[in-house]
Structures are given as structure tokens and as C-alpha cells.
């Protein structure tokens, strides 16, 4: 059985191009060693069109039966990554192939690297497929909604084991280049099948990789080779455009550098990008503006729930200069009438979420104005999802959400299924603690849709979840899409 499963995995490596035909024996022997096995019988039958998930499941069962690992998703992930490492080309080979293909054209290089990142099981295709995805029409365009199910839920045993492991300081975080080839531990994922392409932006060493959880097509991460904290400054804009010049078919954006309005990792300077057009990129300029000293730069307020100033020019240097001017002005800007305070008690509040892209021969930069002030009424943030929407989304509104993609928690899959069941059978929603938090929302829905039934309930819930996301984005907008909000926004623009 083991020999057969190993033969299948090796065949998968040959079929996908991870290994050449001449490395068949070598790879077989590496895999035998992982199982502490010194005997092998080549199967008589030939295997084709191998399904990776099935073969790995066979090999994981074998490892559990032999007592090599515990039957838990954490240990299984560590082990199957070790198996995939036996099929992986070395980093130098990946880099050489990447830049050779880049010589043909940048897209050929990223196509190769994205396929490798999936074939290697670094991106687990069969898990990403489980994510629930749909779109919702809104006044701001077609928004993307996803319930993220590709991050596996840790089981209680693994959580307990992780508690007992003293937290290591190597690698310093999940974005450090030292992750490449790392075997992992209970509280840190294995990254033996992970490859990084070194790139130079702003004359400094950075790394280019894909996100293992791909929230959208070719979701990439670009990170500083050194563990330095996030900081939005002039150099941020230089780096964004250096990358877009290298890969003009990709956009690249940065999370803000302050808590509440920033991303989940503020400790390591990084950007996120990819080959995808978000609703925000399609959103039109609602009001064109001219900024003194930058009359040659097309600028305007975008029709978008967050407060976005879009600037466009064929020369990215002009955009870098203007973005720096806007950033410096916003950092120090206070307008009490609009409830915008640059700082309170010495704590800064104003920052920017920038997104760079190239459209035809024109460079474009979206500057999203952010503010992380809190009040007694809104202790998690005034410009953050308000409490009435926390039953759907209470996490930070980071770069991905800013662009129009809701990344919703996995709990919603079960909760929405339960809601369908309870609504159709007329059961009391407050009687189930898993869904009691949705009670007020459901009351509103029942008034809005008196003819809700088994045929339409699924579509109705999906649509209404999407509309909650719209409200959440509006909450995160410093200047609201109202006459007063636009007037307040123009006061800032006029101050430039």
C-alpha cells in the first residue's frame, strides 16, 4: 500500500512538472525515508491523472497507522508538507526559471510561479474550493463576498499542545523570509513547500510570494526582507510603483499602519496585490478636483463608501510627490465639525490605505483616508464596523475589504444554514445561542420579505449579508456619501 501511494505521489510530481522524469528514483527514496522505510516494491500498474488530496490522504493514514503522527489537522498539515518537500525544486532553481520566463514577459513568470505554488500544495486548492463566494449588487458596484473556510479550524488537542509549546522567536513572524523551507511546529505552519522570489523595490531587498489562502485570483504578498514594522511614508508609494512597473498586470496595495484600521500584521512591512479587478478599481470618479502645484495630475473623489482620493498620471513620480503631499496633510489634519482629529492625548489617528495599479499606459493611485479614533459609544473605532453589524463582521476593515471584498468569518457558514432552517420552520432564533445574535436582523428581513420561502431564502440571506457589508464599509468611511460628508471631504481637499 505504501509503495503504491508513493508511486502515485511521484507520478503527480512528474505530471505537474515539479520533478523531471530523471528524478523518479531519487524522489521515491526521499519519500521512503520520511516513513523510515527501507523497502519498496514498484507497483505493476501505471497511474495517471493523480488527485493530490486523495494520495496525501492515503499517505497520512499510513503515517497515523504507523504511529508517526497524531490524527489531527495540525500534525497532518505538518507531515504532508514534509512529503511535498520531497517533490520541490530548490529555491535557486525556482528563481532561475522565474526570471527566465520573466524575460519572455512578466505574466509568463507569474503564471509559472502561481501554478507552482498550487501544484506544491502550498496553496491547498481543495481547501480554497471550500470557500463560499458570491457577489452582491450595490450602489457602489458589484461587491465580492467570501466566507473563508480554507484556514482549517484547529482541534482542541492541537490548541492544548500549542499552549504547552513555548513561543519560538524563529521565524520572527509568518512573513519573514526564514519561513522558506521551515519544517514548522504545532504553533507555526510548515513551509517546506514554500518558495519566495527575491525582488528589488526602492533599491532594497524584498520578497514576492503568494498567499496560501488566496482570497482572490493570484493573491500575492510582497514583504520586506527584514522584520521591520509597517509604516506609510513617501517610500511606500515608491515601492508600490516599483512593483507595478515590474509586474504591470498586478495591482499592489498596503494596509494602513495604525491599529483598528490596519491589517492583522503590523510588525512586518508588507503589501498585498494580485491579478484581479475589484469593485473599487471599477468605481468612477464622482467629482474631479485640481490640486495646486499638481494641475497636470488627474485627481478626484471616488464614488465609494470609504473616502478615496484617486490620482492618475503617466509619470508615477508625479503621483509619488502628490501622494506624499496628501499623506503629510492628512496626518496633521483636524476638522472638529467633521469629527476628524489628527491626534488625541498624543496618539495619532490619521493614516492612509494606498492602492497602486496601471491602467493602459496610465498609473493610478487610490488614497483611502483612514482614522482610528475611538469613543465611549464606539470603543472599537468610530470609523470601524458599528456594533449593530458585528453579528456579521466585527473584524478590522483592512486593505482587501477596502477594495470591495468581504472576508467573513467561517462561523457564518453554519449560522446562515441554521438561520435558513429556523426561519422556514418558524423556530425561535433566540433559543439557539449560535444564532441569537442575528435576531434583530432577521426581524427586519421578515418585514422586508413577507414571502420568504424555501426557494428564495438562500439568495435573500446572501444578498442581505452583502448589504450588511456595504453598511460596514460606510461605517469605515471618514466622510459619508451624503451632501454634508462631501462638503467635509472638499474642505480637506481644499486645504491641500
Question: Where on the chain are the PLM-derived regions?
Answer:
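Active-site microenvironments that recognize anionic phosphate/pyrophosphate groups
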Residues: 1-222, 226-229, 303-305, 319-323, ...
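Structured alpha-helical segments in the cores of large, soluble enzyme domains
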Residues: 206-211, 236, 240-244, 290-297
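Amphipathic alpha-helical segments that form well-ordered structural scaffolds
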Residues: 239-243, 325, 468
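Catalytic or ion-translocation cores adjacent to nucleophile or general acid/base/metal-coordination motifs
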Residues: 244, 248-267, 273-327, 331-334
Amino acid at each position: 500500500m505504501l509503495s503504491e501511494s508513493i508511486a502515485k505521489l511521484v507520478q503527480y510530481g512528474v505530471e505537474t512538472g515539479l520533478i523531471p522524469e530523471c528524478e523518479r528514483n531519487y524522489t521515491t527514496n526521499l519519500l521512503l525515508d520520511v516513513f523510515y522505510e527501507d523497502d519498496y516494491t514498484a507497483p505493476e500498474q501505471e497511474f495517471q491523472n493523480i488527485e493530490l488530496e486523495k494520495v496525501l490522504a492515503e499517505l497520512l493514514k499510513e503515517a497515523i497507522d504507523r504511529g508517526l503522527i497524531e490524527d489531527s489537522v495540525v500534525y497532518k498539515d505538518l507531515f504532508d508538507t514534509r512529503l511535498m518537500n520531497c517533490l520541490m525544486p530548490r529555491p535557486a532553481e525556482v528563481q532561475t526559471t522565474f526570471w527566465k520566463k520573466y524575460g519572455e514577459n512578466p505574466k509568463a513568470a507569474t503564471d509559472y510561479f502561481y501554478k507552482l505554488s498550487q501544484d506544491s500544495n502550498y496553496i491547498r486548492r481543495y481547501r480554497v474550493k471550500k470557500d463560499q463566494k458570491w457577489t452582491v449588487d450595490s450602489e457602489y458596484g458589484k461587491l465580492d463576498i467570501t466566507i473563508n473556510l480554507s484556514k482549517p479550524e484547529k482541534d482542541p488537542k492541537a490548541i492544548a499542545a500549542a499552549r504547552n509549546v513555548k513561543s519560538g522567536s524563529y521565524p520572527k513572524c509568518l512573513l519573514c523570509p526564514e519561513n522558506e523551507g521551515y519544517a514548522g511546529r504545532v504553533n507555526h505552519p510548515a513551509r517546506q513547500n514554500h518558495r519566495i522570489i527575491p525582488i528589488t523595490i526602492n533599491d532594497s531587498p524584498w520578497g514576492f510570494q503568494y498567499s496560501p489562502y488566496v482570497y482572490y485570483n493570484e493573491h500575492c504578498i510582497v514583504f520586506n526582507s527584514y522584520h521591520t514594522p509597517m509604516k506609510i511614508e513617501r517610500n511606500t508609494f515608491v515601492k508600490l510603483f516599483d512593483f507595478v512597473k515590474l509586474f504591470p498586470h498586478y495591482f499592489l496595495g498596503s494596509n494602513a499602519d495604525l491599529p483598528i484600521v490596519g491589517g492583522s500584521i503590523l510588525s512586518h512591512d508588507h503589501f498585498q496585490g494580485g491579478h484581479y479587478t475589484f469593485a473599487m478599481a471599477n468605481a468612477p470618479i464622482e467629482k474631479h478636483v485640481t490640486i495646486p502645484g499638481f494641475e497636470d495630475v488627474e485627481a478626484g473623489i471616488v464614488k465609494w463608501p470609504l473616502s478615496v482620493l484617486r490620482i492618475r498620471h503617466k509619470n508615477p513620480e508625479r503621483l509619488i510627490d502628490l501622494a506624499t503631499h496628501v499623506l503629510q496633510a492628512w496626518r496633521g489634519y483636524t476638522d472638529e465639525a467633521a469629527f476628524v482629529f489628527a491626534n488625541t492625548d498624543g496618539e495619532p489617528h490619521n493614516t492612509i490605505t494606498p492602492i497602486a495599479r496601471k491602467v493602459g499606459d496610465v498609473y493610478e493611485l487610490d488614497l483611502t483616508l483612514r482614522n482610528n479614533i475611538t469613543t465611549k459609544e464606539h470603543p472599537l473605532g468610530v470609523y470601524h464596523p458599528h456594533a449593530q453589524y458585528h453579528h456579521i463582521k466585527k473584524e478590522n476593515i483592512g486593505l482587501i475589504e477596502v477594495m470591495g471584498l468581504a472576508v467573513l468569518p467561517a462561523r457564518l457558514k453554519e449560522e446562515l444554514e441554521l438561520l435558513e432552517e429556523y426561519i422556514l420552520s418558524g423556530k425561535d432564533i433566540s433559543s439557539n445561542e449560535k444564532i441569537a445574535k442575528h435576531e434583530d436582523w432577521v426581524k427586519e428581513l421578515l418585514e422586508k420579505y413577507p414571502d420568504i420561502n424555501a426557494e428564495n431564502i438562500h439568495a435573500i440571506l446572501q444578498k442581505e449579508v452583502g448589504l450588511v457589508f456595504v453598511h460596514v464599509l460606510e461605517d469605515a468611511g471618514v466622510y459619508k456619501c451624503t451632501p454634508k460628508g462631501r462638503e467635509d471631504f472638499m474642505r480637506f481637499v481644499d486645504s491641500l
